[in-house]
């Protein structure tokens, strides 16, 4: 297949086995350190990119909150429900490129990566057209799910103005996966960081100084996402991405069926995870006197969202490492990368959990001045800490699945663990046994725990040599060569 062993971060050596001898332990520790360095070179910029892009919506909500309660509610609902739906679907559909581009890069089929990205554009822009009705008819959709009429109307109006962001998602995620698979994560980090600064300035200028209100918020958020797209695209067009970009090609329209299947599996896998904790907030709203529990859960989800940025960075890093090494035929190194990143992310999760538990009496006051809300948040902080720990490892295991191309399998696991076991258990504990928000969250955490254990089992019993062979077959079946 013309594999290039000089590709960055690819290493043809076999990883050491931990035999128990002192010398073997030293070698294993040395290799662990080297692999950790490779992972952090990818994860560090990826974490910064995730935080920067997450902050775009958070900053818009912050500035909109200065306009009034209705404006804040409109932006919050649109961001979390309408754009949240689109973000999850688009990110999931684009994640197929993590498998294909990563394995093509490892296999030395660099020129096929640009073709894969164009195929993903075709699929994601088509998907965006199918998602348009959600934006156009947002008010009745939100009202159907119980949102107050005046908030539904305001959020629906804001959703119409945010349609350009939908198509920015369609352009952005394939580009990001294309660059990420080549470990060009520093480029993404620089562009996202610069755009975040511009976004903060423009938000103040258009929302507050010029008093354009929600129109200014929409203009700023749309512009920021398109600046990210344009910046990354200019980098690719100017540098040719080390030969991975050879120009637009009609090959992008070939073999779309298999590509669509993998994209749909990726979207289903990710959306089932992405929406699971969102369901927690919705179900909590069905409790008697839900105002305080919903506020407490929202504070906890805010904390969990920020800590999740670390896991997302490691998700990207391990997806690249596994797909690259499998594509290069280095099955043992792919397995070793999984071990290293699992240990690293779990240790970080333990630290984050300790911080949450140690500050459970004080961090709620960063978000509220209500004693009742703060007390409820403190009461459920133990569940937050455990969720933070689980979610330090679970996205990493999902990243392994994406790198290996197991999206369809993990989607079935997610359906079973989250929606057949976790959610019903939460409903029984919360409503039937009258345990309230603690019961709802406890049941859903049980689903996450079960899913994590199943993924660990799948990874442990995986035949990595067979996965490397399947990666080679996948690259040949969905690409061949870019010259044909």
From Swiss-Prot:
PANTHER family on file: MULTIDRUG RESISTANCE PROTEIN (PTHR11206)
Entry membrane topology: Multi-pass membrane protein
Region feature Disordered, mapped onto this chain: 1-22
Record-linked InterPro entries: MATE_euk, MATE_fam
Biased composition (Basic and acidic residues): 1-16
GO terms assigned for molecular function: antiporter activity; xenobiotic transmembrane transporter activity
Compartmental location: Membrane
Family affiliation: Belongs to the multi antimicrobial extrusion (MATE) (TC 2.A.66.1) family.
Record-given protein name: Protein DETOXIFICATION 33
CDD domains linked to this entry: MATE_eukaryotic
GO biological process: xenobiotic detoxification by transmembrane export across the plasma membrane
Any one annotated GO CC term: plant-type vacuole
Keywords of the record: Membrane, Transmembrane, Transmembrane helix, Transport
Pfam families, alphabetized: MatE
Gene encoding the protein: DTX33
Taxonomic superkingdom: Eukaryota
Transmembrane regions listed in the UniProt entry: 39-59, 81-101, 122-142, 155-175, 190-210, 218-238, 267-287, 294-314, 338-358, 380-400, 409-429, 439-459
């Amino acid at each position: 297949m013309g594999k290039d062993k000089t590709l960055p971060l690819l290493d043809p050596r076999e990883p050491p086995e931990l035999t128990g001898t002192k010398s073997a332990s030293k070698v294993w520790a040395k290799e662990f350190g080297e692999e950790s360095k490779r992972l952090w070179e990818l994860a560090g910029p990826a974490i910064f990119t995730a935080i920067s892009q997450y902050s775009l919506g958070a900053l818009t909500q912050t500035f909109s909150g200065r306009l009034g309660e209705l404006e804040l509610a409109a932006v919050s609902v649109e961001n979390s429900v309408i754009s949240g739906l689109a973000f999850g679907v688009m990110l999931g559909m684009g994640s197929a490129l993590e498998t294909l581009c990563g394995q093509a890069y490892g296999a030395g089929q660099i020129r096929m990566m640009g073709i894969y990205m164009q195929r993903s554009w075709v699929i994601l822009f088509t998907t965006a057209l199918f998602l348009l009705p959600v934006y156009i008819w947002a008010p009745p959709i939100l009202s159907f799910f119980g949102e107050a009429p005046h908030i539904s109307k305001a959020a629906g109006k804001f959703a119409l103005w945010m349609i350009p962001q939908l198509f920015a998602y369609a352009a952005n995620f394939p580009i990001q996966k294309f660059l990420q698979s080549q470990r060009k994560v520093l480029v993404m980090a620089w562009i996202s960081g610069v755009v975040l600064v511009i976004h903060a300035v423009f938000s103040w200028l258009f929302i507050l100084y010029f008093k354009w209100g929600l129109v200014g918020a929409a203009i700023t958020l749309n512009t920021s996402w398109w600046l990210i797209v344009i910046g990354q695209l200019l980098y690719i067009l100017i540098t040719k991405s080390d030969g991975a970009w050879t120009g637009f090609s009609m090959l992008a329209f070939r073999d779309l069926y298999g590509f669509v299947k993998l994209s749909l599996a990726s979207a289903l896998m990710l959306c089932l995870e992405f929406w699971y904790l969102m369901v927690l907030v919705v179900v909590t709203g069905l409790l008697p006197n839900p105002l305080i529990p919903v506020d407490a859960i929202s504070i906890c989800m805010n904390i969990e969202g920020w800590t999740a940025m670390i896991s997302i960075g490691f998700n990207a890093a391990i997806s690249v490492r596994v797909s690259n090494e499998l594509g290069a035929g280095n099955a043992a190194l792919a397995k070793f990368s999984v071990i290293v990143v699992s240990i690293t992310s779990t240790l970080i999760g333990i630290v984050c959990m300790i911080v949450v538990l140690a500050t459970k009496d004080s961090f709620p006051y960063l978000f509220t001045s209500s004693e009742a809300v703060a007390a409820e948040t403190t009461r459920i902080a133990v569940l937050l800490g455990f969720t933070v720990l689980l979610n330090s490892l679970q996205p990493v295991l999902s990243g392994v699945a994406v790198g290996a191309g197991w999206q369809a399998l993990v989607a079935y696991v997610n359906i079973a663990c989250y929606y057949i076991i976790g959610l019903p258990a939460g409903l029984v504990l919360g409503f039937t046994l009258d345990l309230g928000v603690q019961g709802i969250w406890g049941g859903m955490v049980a689903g996450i725990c079960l899913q994590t254990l199943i993924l660990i089992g799948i990874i442990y019993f995986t035949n990595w040599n067979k996965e490397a062979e399947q990666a080679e077959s996948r690259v040949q079946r969905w690409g061949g060569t870019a010259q044909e």
